[in-house]
Amino acid sequence: KIGDEVRSLADEVPFDIPDSWEWVRLGELFQHNTGKALNAANCTGQLKQYITTSNLYWDRFELDNLKEMYFSESEIEKCTVIKGDLLVCEGGDIGRASIWSYDYPMCIQNHIHRLRAYVPLCTRFFYYLFDLYKHIGWIGGKGIGIQGLSSNAIHSLLFPLPPLAEQHRIVETIDKLQPYTDAYADVESTLDTLNTTFPERLKKSILQEAVQGKLVPQDSSDEPAEALLERI
């Protein structure tokens, strides 16, 4: 809020997007909640393995030496992730994200947000948005970026929403370009003369083009994002 007035979306949008896109709050697209807080005194319910922020890395998980704690039936429903859920760190490396891609469910601790889409979306597109927001300091950065990711903060995050077909095309293009940014990262480790920040700048540039609707051609036959929102 600014004083007693709630800022409108128009006051907050950081860049222009194509006409077929929409600016939306993350909470409009995803049901989200955090996991269970560690409570050593709680010894009732089912003993379950769980992951913490120390298991969640960008686009991957480290699942060795998982810990266990007790979960009640209601906690299992609230704190279990399934294949396709987007997980985001609330603490630790704030905003770090990965998609749970395993065929089995897993419980989460309270410093991880579970995001589950209300309607069919390309979840990986939103993973890349978190990647971009983290790299440019809009999440967990210094200055005016969001310093923490409470439930209210993540609910209010402003994201560009392309048509679903375009979401998939953007992800396909980024995935094709990713090996080139990785190759630059390998080169920088062996060549002292190479600007060490170039791979990150290149990645940020690619992601920035993607979320502004400039990475892939616009297709007039795509169902607009507005129609996607109407189904929520």
Question: At which residue positions do the language-model features occur?
Answer:
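Short coil/turn segments at secondary-structure boundaries
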Residues: N39-L47, N65, G140-I144, P217-E223
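Non-catalytic DNA-recognition/assembly elements of restriction-modification systems
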Residues: R7-K36, L164, H168-V171, Y180, ...
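Conserved hydrophobic residue
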Residues: I154, L215-V216
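Core structural elements
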Residues: K1-I2, K176, T197-Q212
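A short beta-sheet element
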Residues: T52-T53, M69-Y133, G141-G143, G148-S150, ...
